[in-house]
């Protein structure tokens, strides 16, 4: 890529210019000289330019890091610094404040009064949500909205009505501006529309049966619980299927109740999810109420038909379920959506145990997403025993609590999750009853909302524990769903608490882990991607643990092991086996031919010592005869069989001493003449000479 600065230099070095400059003379330096250093421009200028430009990515990353760091700080410290608002329960402030604080936290802006800062938040929130939306492919939105076609026409119609009103921001806006929703009807309209569309898209994706059933539950709850907002969206709700009812319900609730968390689905830790849920609860437990608990969802396919038939029963069920939800997942408007959508077990606010939840759609779907993805194989199985007893007992309890004080919890929602968890860590009192055997899972999962508001400690543990329980037992989903529906409706049934078989040590470990993990909601949303990745990692961790527990539960008993494994043998049995093996080996060896047979077939020759000696004597005789018949050296020389070099005697060097005093070193002239004569004879008679060179020799005359 050419650098712009270099291009700026280049025009000077056109060919014509170069010639002119050369002709111009010595005074004007030739322009070509400039180009000599253009290489440096290539190297340095773009570098400087890039360096000066501030990187958006860098800024975003730094913001994300700041948020993450802030997440690690305890809530009290953040409240002191003014980053977070105190919770309504603690400071008696507006329920909207926690969500505002969260929003501000996300933006890292100081927080004023929730109401006073609400306009600003409304402005900021759309921006943040817009960025969120961008991350979420618009095609997904369209698909989700398009999927409404599967629902009845009334619902589809209601959805389009909602959809055109808000572009992309409004949906986010209602969620974020739901804090201020009560203040402006116009805002409400847009927010409800946006949320409706938003939630509809999310909820639609789930199985229509489950959605409709859960939505009808939510709708009935809405009618009973939230009268004032109901008229707003309820017209659409009755007309539309339950799914639309759920969105409308969620919108109505935001419209009615000021604080609703920004829609960012970020479940970064348990914190964001918890933050979302706790905020939703803060904004109004109404929201959590309308959402039937996930356990009912599991039975929802069958539940959907009766949902509308008796509002009272459903409302009782829904409140109970909602109570469960609030206890387990602190359902906010998100939860209503969630409940219809996923047949998965109660959404634990506590993410560490939320193993298989990876949002199916873009993070937009909020909590719904995590829930939806619980692998039914793990969760549903274990949960259903619990859920049955929980549903049986919970309706009663929730009837007492919910109907005794239906609107009080909505106004004064239970303490936020992080506070409850801290209390749980500090005060072990609530846990002692819960820890006892059969009722442990049940009470942990669905402790009264009263106990929640009073002892947040139960919530922390409840939150963490439900999931451990969820994932351990896995009966078939369909069977369990059928069972759960009737149990949900029969409120007076005595609770048969079925506890998944999780070893006590494992349970305690998971409780500890979940407590430590769910430190408390920091009330803002993180970037979706980070949240998803973190969540998935956490989910996988929990899933691994739970699968381990499952495997431990499914280990075969000793008799089964004995059946399948190599049985232990007594000494007698081992001896028998050895004897059998020995017999087979002996039989095979016995089949080998004996030496006699081999001799008969001339394969093996019989040998005696006398025979061997005779053979040796014969060999000697033969050899001696041959040696005696050997010709002498003279004969061989005469017959020219031996050559000169073959019969000359050779003396070893060590034997041959050259010292002068030795006689053999002194050759007499006679010895020398004899040697010469022998050599000449050899040359003349035996040594071959080439024909052409014979005339050079003394003995070979040409």
Curated annotation (Swiss-Prot):
Low complexity bias locations: 233-250
Subcellular location: Cytoplasm; Cell projection, Lamellipodium
Biased composition (Pro residues): 163-173, 342-362
Alphabetically ordered keywords of this record: Actin-binding, Cell projection, Cytoplasm, Developmental protein, Neurogenesis, Phosphoprotein, Repeat
Regions that span the bilayer: none
Primary localization: cytoplasm
GO CC, any one term: cytoplasm
Intervals holding RPEL repeats: 63-88, 583-608, 621-646
Family annotation (InterPro entries): RPEL_repeat
Its biological purpose: Regulator of protein phosphatase 1 (PP1) required for neural tube and optic fissure closure, and enteric neural crest cell (ENCCs) migration during development. Acts as an activator of PP1 by interacting with PPP1CA and preventing phosphorylation of PPP1CA at 'Thr-320'. During neural tube closure, localizes to the ventral neural tube and activates PP1, leading to down-regulate cell proliferation within cranial neural tissue and the neural retina.
Name the UniProt record assigns to this protein: Phosphatase and actin regulator 4
GN (gene name): PHACTR4
């Amino acid at each position: 890529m050419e650098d712009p600065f270099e291009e700026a230099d280049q025009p000077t070095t056109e060919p014509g210019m170069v010639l002119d400059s050369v002709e111009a003379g010595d005074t004007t330096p030739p322009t070509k000289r400039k180009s000599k250093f253009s290489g440096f421009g290539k190297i340095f200028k773009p570098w400087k330019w890039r360096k000066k430009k501030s990187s958006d990515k860098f800024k975003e990353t730094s913001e994300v890091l700041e948020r993450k760091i802030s997440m690690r700080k305890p809530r009290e410290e953040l409240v002191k610094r003014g980053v977070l608002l105190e919770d309504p329960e603690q400071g008696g402030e507006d329920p909207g404040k926690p969500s505002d604080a969260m929003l501000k936290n996300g933006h890292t802006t100081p927080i004023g009064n929730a109401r006073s800062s609400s306009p600003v938040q409304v402005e900021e929130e759309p921006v943040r949500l817009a960025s969120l939306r961008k991350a979420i492919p618009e095609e997904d939105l369209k698909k989700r909205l398009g999927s409404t076609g599967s629902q009845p026409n009334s619902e589809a119609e209601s959805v389009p009505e909602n959809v055109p009103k808000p572009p992309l921001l409004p949906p986010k806006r209602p969620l974020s501006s739901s804090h201020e929703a009560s203040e402006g009807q116009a805002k409400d309209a847009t927010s409800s529309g946006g949320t409706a569309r938003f939630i509809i898209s999310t909820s639609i994706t789930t199985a229509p049966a489950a959605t409709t059933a859960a939505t009808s539950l939510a709708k009935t709850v809405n009618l009973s619980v939230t009268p004032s907002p109901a008229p707003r969206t309820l017209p659409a709700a009755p007309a539309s299927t339950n799914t639309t009812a759920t969105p409308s319900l969620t919108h109505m609730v935001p419209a009615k109740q000021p604080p609703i968390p920004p829609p960012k689905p970020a479940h970064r830790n348990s914190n964001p999810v918890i933050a979302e849920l706790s905020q939703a609860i803060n904004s109004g437990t109404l929201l959590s109420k309308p959402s039937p608990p996930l356990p009912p969802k599991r039975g929802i396919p069958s539940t959907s038909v009766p949902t509308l038939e008796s509002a009272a029963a459903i409302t009782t069920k829904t409140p109970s379920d909602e109570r469960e939800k609030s206890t387990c997942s602190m359902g906010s408007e998100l939860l209503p959506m969630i409940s219809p959508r996923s047949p998965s077990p109660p959404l634990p606010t506590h993410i560490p145990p939320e193993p298989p939840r990876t949002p199916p759609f873009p993070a937009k779907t909020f909590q719904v997403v995590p829930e939806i993805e619980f692998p039914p194989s793990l969760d549903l199985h274990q949960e259903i025993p619990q859920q049955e007893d929980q549903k049986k007992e919970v309706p009663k309890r929730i009837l007492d609590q919910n109907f005794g004080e239906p609107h009080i919890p909505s106004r004064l929602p239970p303490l936020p999750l992080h506070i409850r968890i801290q209390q749980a860590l500090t005060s072990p009192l609530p846990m002692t009853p819960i820890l006892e055997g059969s009722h442990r899972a049940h009470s942990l999962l669905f402790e009264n909302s009263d106990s929640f508001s009073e002892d947040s400690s139960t919530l922390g543990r409840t939150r963490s524990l439900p999931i451990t329980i969820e994932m351990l037992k896995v009966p078939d989903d369909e069977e369990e769903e059928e069972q759960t529906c009737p149990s949900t409706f029969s409120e007076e049934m005595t609770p048969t608490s079925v506890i998944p078989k999780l070893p006590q040590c494992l349970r305690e470990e998971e409780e500890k882990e979940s407590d430590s993990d769910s430190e408390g909601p920091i009330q803002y949303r993180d970037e979706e991607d980070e949240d998803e990745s973190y969540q998935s990692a956490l989910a996988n961790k929990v899933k691994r643990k739970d699968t381990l527990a499952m495997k431990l539960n499914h280990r075969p008993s000793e008799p089964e092991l004995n059946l399948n494994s190599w049985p232990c043998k007594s000494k007698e049995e081992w001896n028998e086996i050895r004897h059998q093996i020995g017999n087979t080996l002996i039989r095979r060896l016995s089949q080998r031919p004996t030496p006699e047979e081999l001799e008969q077939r001339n394969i093996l020759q019989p040998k005696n010592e006398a025979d061997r000696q005779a053979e040796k004597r014969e060999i000697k005789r033969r050899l001696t005869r041959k040696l005696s018949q050997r010709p002498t050296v003279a004969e061989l020389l005469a017959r020219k069989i031996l050559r000169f070099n073959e019969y000359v005697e050779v003396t070893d060097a060590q034997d041959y001493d050259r010292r002068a005093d030795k006689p053999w070193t002194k050759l007499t002239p006679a010895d020398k003449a004899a040697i010469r004569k022998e050599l000449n004879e050899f040359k003349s008679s035996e040594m071959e000479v080439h024909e052409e060179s014979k005339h050079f020799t003394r003995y070979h005359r040409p």
